[in-house]
Each structure stands twice: as structure tokens, then as C-alpha cells.
């Protein structure tokens, strides 16, 4: 009897050790079809059409925490892409970190979402195609190997983040990030910005984004304004590249169905080529149907036009997919 109890206790030890580890993830894939046309003068050339089975951003992760006493906890997460199409591999290629959490907030080190990326709720779309989401305004959003501090919820302040020079990739460009978040009765205001210097193509680069909206019960609505400015290192270019962009998204849940629509516009800014028109308009519409709390069907369509008149690029795309969370 004693031997049986010992064996049972030993068998339970690995389970106890794993008790604070959570396995989670999302599997999502679908079919997308697209058509794009580049217009030059009176001619339409570079016509491209494509239909493909696409992974829509599947992932798998492990996370956990340990109580260290006196209100202090060790926290960790290891998250990676897990494409069902088999086109991506590697560990820790999504948000992965180790850190400490307590009354002071939390400090993490690893591959972390930028503060700017955490304000991307106005772009809820899930698709592989560049045109099935607000990809232009979302372009500066990244994950950095960095150290990040997130404060407790007080006075609206939220986070600061630093990317060291030697962790910024081949460009060797350190960057500084900061943001705040204020919420009250469903209304919210978010700000995020970053400053980067000494990269290969730019001497200085800064982005500022302000997002405001309402998110409560069945209704979500938001407006985002973003301004980018870059001082270029190439002497034969204009001294600055800059652009202001706006985006708006609205969604409302009717039972198991959540339709949504987004619109984005990029105003004409200064670019390396004075003849290059960097204005754009984009519309994405779609809906989700929830079969259960974990499984949903996705359908969406997008349209983008960059430039105007006889010099423009136009793309349309549609997609359907299935998503399961675990």
C-alpha cells in the first residue's frame, strides 16, 4: 500500500509542476482571391489575379506565473507562429518574454509588442492579404527585442519601452517608445509614439498615434489619427518623408453575428519623389459568425486605391475562413 502511494505521489509531481502553465492558441485559415491593377497614363498594366489557401495567423503559446510572495509574481510567455500551411517555423517568433509583476506594475524582457502595436484595436481584421486589413496605417507596428515597463492603471499612464542598439536587427537603430491609455464607462483614449534614430535609410524616424472610441457590450467604434515623419540619410532625396493618416472602424454584435466596417485615408505628404502621390483610400467590410465561444466563420472584402487620376494602383480582395481558439 505504501509503495502504491509513493508511486502515485511521484506520478503526480509533473502535473503539479505544470499546474501554472497555460497552453493556448488559435488555428485559422481560409481562401482568399484578389485582383490588382496599376494604371499608368491611359493604360492599365501589371494586372495580377490570385486565389490561394491561406493561413490567417495561426499561433500556439505557453504562459505561466509563479507567486514569489509579498505580492510579487514571476511571469513568462513563449508564443510562436503555427501556420497550418506549414510556411513558418521557429520558437518565440511572436510575443515571448520573462518578467516580474506586482503593485508597481510589470517589467518584461523579450520579444514584446511595441506600445504602438497595442493600440491597434481599430484594425481587427484577420487575413493574409495586405488589402484585407488596414495595413498601411498599421505598418509601423512591430515586435521588438526590448525591455518594457507597464504601470498599474493610474493617471492614464501605461508603458515605456526601450530597444537597445544591438537588438534592433541589421539596421542597428535604438528606439524609444511610450504611451498611455484612459478608459471610463466604455469610452477610451489611447496614445502611443516612438522615436528611432540612426537606421540605414533614416537619420531620425518618429510616429505618433491617437485613438479614441467606445467599446462596451455589443458596440465598438473608434477613430485613429497617425502622423509619421522621417529624416532621410540619402543626400539625393528630400530631407523628410512624412504622412498623416486616419482610420475609423465600427462593429455591432447581433446575437452570433458581428458585422464590421473600416475606412482609412492617407493624406498627401512629402516623399522622396515629388511626383509620387502617396495618398490612398481603403475600405474593408466583413462579418463573423460564432458557432460557439471558440469557433467562428469569417468573411471579408477589401478595396484599396493608391494615387489618383491616370497614375494609380487599385486592388480588390475577398476572403472566407474558419477560426478556432483553444
Swiss-Prot record:
Keyword entries, A-Z: Cell outer membrane, Ion transport, Membrane, Porin, Signal, Transmembrane, Transmembrane beta strand, Transport
Topology versus the membrane: Multi-pass membrane protein
A single GO molecular function term of this UniProt record: porin activity
Secretion signal, residue range per the UniProt entry: 1-19
GO cellular component terms given for this protein: cell outer membrane; pore complex
CDD domains assigned: gram_neg_porins
Family the UniProt entry places it in: Belongs to the Gram-negative porin family.
Quaternary assembly: Homotrimer.
Protein name: Major outer membrane protein P.IA
InterPro entries: Gram-neg_bact_OMP, Gram_neg_porin_domain, Porin_dom_sf, Porin_Gram-ve, Porin_Gram-ve_CS, Porin_Neis
Subcellular location: Cell outer membrane
Gene Ontology biological process terms, A to Z: monoatomic ion transmembrane transport
Job of this protein: Serves as a slightly cation selective porin. Major antigen on the gonococcal cell surface and it may have pathogenic properties in addition to its porin activity.
TM region(s), chain numbering: none
Organism of provenance: Neisseria gonorrhoeae
GN (gene name): porA
Amino acid at each position: 500500500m505504501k509503495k502504491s502511494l509513493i508511486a502515485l505521489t511521484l506520478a503526480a509531481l509533473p502535473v503539479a509542476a505544470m499546474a501554472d502553465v497555460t497552453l493556448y492558441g488559435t488555428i485559422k485559415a481560409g481562401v482568399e482571391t484578389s485582383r490588382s491593377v496599376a494604371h499608368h497614363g491611359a493604360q492599365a498594366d501589371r494586372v495580377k489575379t490570385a486565389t490561394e489557401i491561406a493561413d490567417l495567423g495561426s499561433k500556439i503559446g505557453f504562459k505561466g506565473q509563479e507567486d514569489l510572495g509579498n505580492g510579487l509574481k514571476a511571469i513568462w510567455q513563449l508564443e510562436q507562429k503555427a501556420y497550418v500551411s506549414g510556411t513558418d517555423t521557429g520558437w518565440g517568433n511572436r510575443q515571448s518574454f520573462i518578467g516580474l509583476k506586482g503593485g508597481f506594475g510589470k517589467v518584461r524582457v523579450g520579444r514584446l509588442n511595441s506600445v504602438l502595436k497595442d493600440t491597434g484595436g481599430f484594425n481587427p481584421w484577420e487575413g493574409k492579404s495586405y488589402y484585407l486589413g488596414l495595413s498601411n496605417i498599421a505598418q509601423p507596428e512591430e515586435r521588438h527585442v526590448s525591455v518594457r515597463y507597464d504601470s498599474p492603471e493610474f493617471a492614464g499612464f501605461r508603458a515605456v519601452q526601450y530597444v537597445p542598439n544591438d537588438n534592433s536587427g541589421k539596421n542597428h537603430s535604438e528606439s524609444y517608445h511610450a504611451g498611455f491609455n484612459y478608459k471610463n464607462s466604455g469610452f477610451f483614449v489611447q496614445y502611443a509614439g516612438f522615436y528611432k534614430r540612426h537606421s540605414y535609410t533614416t537619420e531620425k524616424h518618429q510616429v505618433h498615434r491617437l485613438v479614441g472610441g467606445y467599446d462596451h457590450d455589443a458596440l465598438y467604434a473608434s477613430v485613429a489619427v497617425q502622423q509619421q515623419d522621417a529624416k532621410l540619410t540619402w543626400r539625393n532625396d528630400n530631407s523628410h518623408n512624412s504622412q498623416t493618416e486616419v482610420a475609423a472602424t465600427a462593429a455591432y454584435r447581433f446575437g452570433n453575428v458581428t458585422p464590421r466596417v473600416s475606412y482609412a485615408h492617407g493624406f498627401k505628404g512629402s516623399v522622396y519623389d515629388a511626383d509620387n502621390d502617396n495618398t490612398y483610400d481603403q475600405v474593408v467590410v466583413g462579418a463573423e459568425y460564432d458557432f460557439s465561444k471558440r469557433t467562428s466563420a469569417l468573411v471579408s472584402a477589401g478595396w484599396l486605391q493608391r494615387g489618383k487620376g491616370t497614375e494609380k494602383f487599385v486592388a480588390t480582395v475577398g476572403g472566407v475562413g474558419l477560426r478556432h481558439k483553444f
